[in-house]
Structure formats: C-alpha cells, structure tokens
C-alpha cells in the first residue's frame, strides 16, 4: 500500500511540474513575466507586476498612518438580503451576474492617482483629484433603500449595511461620498480630516484591463486554454494592491542556531515549537511600519465596483417603480431579482444610459444558473443532479422558489422555463457549513427534503451540523483528520455560528 501511495504521489508531482512549466511558458509568451517561484510566487503577484509595468508610473505606495487610514475606508463586496431580512418567496426569479465586476470597475476608474498624498482638515480641497476623508454624518433624507449605500462596522467588526447612519463617523473615499450625495435627496456632513491627491491620474489602467479582457475573449472563442491566464490575472489584479501587513514570520532553525537566534531576537519572539525532524520553529514579530502597498488603489477599485452595482440595485426605488422591492439578495457582483422586475430594469437602464444591461460584453449581466453543482431528491435522499440536460428542452434555468436565511445562506429551487413540470433542482449555500454536512443532515433528519431544512433555518431554529474530513495542521507541522460539530442559528441580528 505504501509503494502504491508513493507511486501516485510521485506521478502527481510530475504532473504538477509539467502544468507549472506550461503555465510559465504561456506567461512569458503573453506577458513577458516569469513566474519563477523566486520573485513571483502567485497569480496575484504576477498580475500586480503586470499592473506595475503598465499603470503605476508617477504614483507612490503608501505606508504607516496613511495606509491604516485608507484601510479603514476599504469595504469588500456588498452581501445581504433585502433589508437584511430572511426571505421565502415563490416567483420566477433570475440570478443575474455582472461580468468581471472588478475589471469593469478598473475600466471605469479615472486612473491611479499621481504624486504623494497630502493632509487636509475641515474642508476638502477643491483641487483634489481623489481623497479619503473622515466625516460625521449630520442629516440624511432619501429613500429607505433595501440595499443601503453605506456599511457601518458594528461592535463585532462586521460590516452592517444600514440606512440608519445619522450621527455616524465614517472614513470613505471620493466615490462613496458622491454616491451618498447623488442617491439621497439631502445629505449633510461635517469634514474632520483626510488625505488627498492633486496631481491628476495615470490613466493607463483602463486601457490595460480592456486589452486583457478583449484578448481573453479572442482566446476563449478560439478554444485556447491560455484564456484562463487572462481570467486569473484580471480577477486577481486588485487584491495584491491591498496586501495586508505581514506582522509575523516563521523562522526554522537547526539546533546549533537556536541559542544565538534567541539571544538576538528575544524581544520579538511570539512562540517556539520543536518540529518532528528536530528543527525549531520560531514565530517572530515583524515591524509593520516597513510595509508599503497601493491600498488607496484597492479601495478605489472596491468603491467603483459598488458604485456600478448601486446603479442596478437602487434605481427602481429611486424612480419609485411599482416593481421596486423585487430584488431579494445581492452577493458582490450578482443579484436575485424577479423576472418582471428585471425586464423593467433593462428598460430603465436603456433609457438612462443608452446601452444594454444584459449581454456578453465586459460589465454586462448574464444569467448565472446552471445544472452543475445542483441536487435532486431520489428515494428520499438528496443526491447530485443526474438528469440529462435535454430534459430542460432547450429552456433556461430559473428559480421558482427562493429561501434566504442571511449572508451567503440561501436555497434556490430551480426549474426550466420550457419544462416546469418535470424539472426540480436545488442549488444551496450555507456559509461555514460544507455541502456534504448539509446533505448528511438533510438525508438523515429530513428524508432529503432540503426545503424543509431551510424553512427551519429561516424560522430561527438552532441546527447542529457535523463537519467531517477536515485537515488540521499542528504547530509541529503534523496533519490530522478531524471532525467538528457546528451549531447554526439565524436571528434578527444575523447568523450565529458556534
């Protein structure tokens, strides 16, 4: 058995080596960047190098107090149900996904700010190209949006998307402040202080991303697997800009090196472990004031991405459409919306912007439901979908019933618009709980009826799931297979995981 395992382990390593060599060859061919496992270790690093070569001339990295100030303005994708309430609704519902949201945001950006950041107090300088500012919100009058514009960090450090923002002090960037002003009837605020740039923009980021998207589209049409490199680089391109400070590092020492290292670094040592081979692993603190990144660029991209989604999420409420309230859930770049509301939204968009909302171009929307990853009920068991795609009769999948418990916790009951009577598939998510754990719970206690399980979750019932097959790495490097019980409950204040 050991020889068998060794043989397949060696074969896996050979296959990985061949794949890496092919990836490296294509990276050199298309980008003249060598992912050589020395200077560049990851796709994010490769993408960042490409942006550095093309888009960051005359711009500066930031560090220290400026970096931490800008970081406090940085908020990830908006993920919530409408008004943060649980939802169970029967209707024709679409899951519309925006193509390449973050690359779209980079194309829409004015560029990367040139020059060094400068300090301001009390008044935002009119000559500012871009700024990050701390404000106190004095007065807000406008629609009570299902998907609020601003997230306020609560006592647990979780972003709470709320319309109740009067009296709050927040740090935001130019785009978010403009959105707060534009999407409300009245918005009054007091400026405290901030940082700004006033030397214009390096505008190459838009053309660089657009070239990558168009090149990927061409390769994809030709069936060239190199299109995946372009996809990876575009999706990873913003993350490396906001790399968090690395505040500690592991040092591995042979026995003869230990005493000298401890004597010279005793004030920075956090933890010491002896490894199975006799070496010593020392966790050592690193100074974070030497960490530089492009946090302001990462925050600008995230702000622009949410701005693009707001133009879809908020417009029907803003114009007081009778179909407002038919967007039920959003997760960063996608929305669950009723079919009739989507048709109206397309019309509103076309009249306002003169472009098509749905399509295959960068930034347009497309339906994201597909059969892969779905489940069916068979013999009172929830099993992976086994029906042939022909049973859809050429129709498109949509959700005929939606259950939303909270963030990243929902169930879609899918069917085909050409064969409603014979097709019923299930697509679900439950953050913090593996698919296998949900399926086991469903089959053991609900006879495969996953709708009944989600009804209990929406009702606020506490539910215990057993997570199995997990790997835990010990401080000494040993790896063990473990299982864990996790209790889930959804309340008015959000999900509780124990």
Describe each model-derived feature in a short phrase.
Residues 1-498:
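Conserved acidic
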């Amino acid at each position: 058995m050991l020889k068998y395992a060794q043989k397949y382990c060696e074969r896996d390593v050979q296959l990985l080596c061949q794949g890496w060599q092919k990836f490296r060859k294509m990276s050199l061919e298309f980008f003249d960047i060598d992912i050589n496992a020395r200077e560049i270790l990851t796709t994010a690093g490769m993408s960042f190098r490409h942006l550095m070569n093309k888009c960051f001339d005359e711009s500066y990295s930031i560090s220290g107090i400026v970096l931490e100030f800008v970081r406090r303005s940085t908020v990830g994708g908006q993920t919530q149900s409408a008004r943060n309430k649980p939802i169970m609704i029967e209707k024709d519902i679409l899951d519309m996904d925006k193509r390449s949201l973050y690359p779209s945001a980079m194309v829409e950006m004015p560029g990367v700010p040139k020059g060094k950041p400068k300090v301001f107090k009390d008044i935002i300088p009119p000559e500012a190209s871009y700024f990050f500012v701390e404000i106190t919100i004095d007065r807000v009058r406008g629609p009570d949006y299902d998907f609020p514009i601003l997230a306020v960090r609560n006592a647990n450090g979780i972003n709470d998307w709320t319309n109740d923002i009067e009296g709050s002090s927040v740090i935001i960037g130019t785009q978010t402040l403009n959105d707060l002003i534009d999407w409300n009837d009245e918005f009054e605020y007091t400026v405290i202080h901030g940082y700004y740039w006033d030397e214009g923009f390096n505008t190459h980021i838009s053309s660089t991303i657009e070239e990558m998207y168009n090149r990927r589209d061409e390769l994809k049409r030709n069936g060239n697997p190199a299109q995946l490199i372009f996809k990876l680089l575009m999706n990873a391109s913003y993350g490396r800009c906001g790399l968090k400070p690395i505040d500690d590092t592991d040092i591995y020492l042979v026995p003869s090196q230990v005493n000298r290292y401890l004597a010279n670094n005793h004030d920075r040592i956090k933890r010491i472990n002896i490894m199975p081979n006799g070496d010593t692993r020392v966790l050592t603190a690193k100074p974070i004031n030497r960490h530089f990144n492009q946090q302001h660029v990462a925050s600008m991209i995230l702000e622009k991405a949410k701005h693009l989604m707001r133009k879809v999420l908020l417009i029907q409420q803003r114009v007081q459409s009778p179909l407002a309230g038919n967007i039920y859930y959003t997760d960063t770049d996608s929305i669950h919306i009723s079919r009739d509301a989507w048709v109206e939204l397309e019309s509103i968009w076309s009249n306002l912007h003169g472009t098509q909302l749905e399509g295959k171009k960068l930034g347009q929307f497309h339906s994201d439901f597909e059969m892969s990853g779905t489940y069916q009920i068979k013999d009172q068991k929830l099993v992976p979908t086994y029906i042939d795609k022909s049973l859809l009769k050429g129709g498109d999948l949509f959700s005929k019933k939606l259950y939303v418990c909270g963030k990243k916790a929902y169930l879609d009951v899918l069917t085909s618009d050409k064969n409603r009577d014979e097709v019923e598939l299930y697509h679900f998510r439950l953050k913090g709980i593996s698919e296998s754990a949900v399926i086991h719970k469903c089959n053991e206690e609900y006879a495969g009826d996953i709708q009944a399980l989600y009804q209990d979750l929406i009702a606020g019932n506490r539910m215990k799931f057993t997570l199995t097959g997990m790997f835990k790495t010990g401080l000494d490097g040993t790896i063990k297979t473990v299982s864990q019980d996790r209790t889930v409950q959804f309340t008015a204040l959000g999900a509780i995981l124990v």
